[in-house]
Amino acid sequence: MSKWLDNAIFYEIYPQSFKDSNADGIGDFQGIIEKLDYINELGCNALWINPCFESPFGDAGYDVSDYCSAAPRYGTNEDLKRIFTEAHKRNMHVLLDLVPGHTSVEHKWFKESMKAKRNEYSDRYIWTDSIWEEPEGMGCIRGISDRDGSCVVNFFSHQPALNYGFYKIDRPWQQSMDDKGPRNTLEAMKDVMRFWLNMGCDGFRVDMAGSLVKNDEEGKGTIKLWQNVREFLDREFPDAAMVSEWGEPDKSLLGGFHMDFLLHFGPSHYNDLFRCDEPYFSIRGKGDISEFVNKYKESYEKSQRKGLICIPSGNHDMDRLAKRLNENELKIAFAFLLSMPGAPFIYYGDEIGMKYIDNLESVEGGYDRTGSRSPMQWDNSTNAGFSCAPSEKLYIPVDISKERPTVEQQKADDNSLYNEIKKLIKIRKSYKSLQSKGEIEFICAEKHKYPFAYIRSFENEKILVILNPSNNKQDFNCNLTLKNTVYYFGEEI
């Protein structure tokens, strides 16, 4: 695993909403470059940039029409390369968002695959043999091509699924992972990875990583596929980092990923922390962290230290943290996020407590996710400093509430969420026990009870973390000898 991941703290950038440098209402590469110092000053030393490739943007860029060309609305390939260069000057690393499971219907591969006459792309996607046959248990598109067949889709109906084969074959049109079509698809995706890694990218966050091989309930085929990719990367790009959207670390890390996310879907109980009716990190003190801890311990033991289990503050698919938590609750939530093993991921704006905006019209397939994708709030100038464009031209409307937080206001307030997170990041970087590879031992995580406590350790260094998000004082007994306090916030336990 790349050495730089030992102390990596990631910042997720949704590029169209981060910073607009040319007044067209859409964030861009130059805007990201202008704000690298801000991210670096916060303490984050790595970026994850959401899809920024050519796309008709039916799903905000997760419908790629050309994997090797930057979307013109953000800039050029050279502009993106400059992000890599400028980040590296600041000892920062950059992950791009790879979408290997499907493309847009506008991709040239799909246009060729739709043709009735066989060609090199005929098996690049998953097709049935007849337009009258629908793939069981999978969505499809049909009746849009000369080719006789229905094409499997992964998500929206304009996102045809790329063909990596079937682990278990039960229909004549299904191909095995070892057939020529699936093997060519995998090699084509390796070529995409080569292209960007050679340009200076440091690795990839991989979209829907656990779903590439079909009829693969236990994930054995998909694990084998990613092990193949890991061999290729270790051979050609040994420092490239990979994080998966899988949500099952024992499978992802076995497949060769360095990191896997705990997510709002899957078995992790991640939602119990911040995104349920009674979150554990709410002041009401009615939450339960025990199920999360049980699943975390299970994943931690199964993963056998093959990689990192990452707990994000949020992402572009989730409600914002601040939808359910107030500023003090957020401070304690970040004390948790920044003291756990794995690499922390901070979604842009979460560090200032940006709100989820209700009742926004869907933009580019966002639907109820749109409220978490509003423009970054830099200051109280026009459009919160995001863009000089007329407000009606903005990609998504900016939060217009009077109490909206801004970077400018938060930086000026010593007691702000931003400054608390900055302090927590500095502490994390100062103690190896708090970093990615430090061990963890849970010592108090009882059902429906507070506080929550664990010990982080590395060699002879040990740090006890005690968290009581509730509004009630709690007793905590332990037989440890404590030398000094590293960090303290709120009332005494």
Residue ranges with predicted function:
Residues 470-493:
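C-terminal beta-sandwich/jelly-roll accessory domains of carbohydrate-active enzymes
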Residues 179-192, 196, 287-297:
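A Trp-anchored, charged/polar loop motif used as the substrate-binding/catalytic surface
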Residues 45-46, 91-93, 193, 202-205, ...:
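Beta-sheet entry/capping signal
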Residues 2-184, 198, 209-257, 376:
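Acidic/aromatic-lined carbohydrate-recognition and catalytic surfaces
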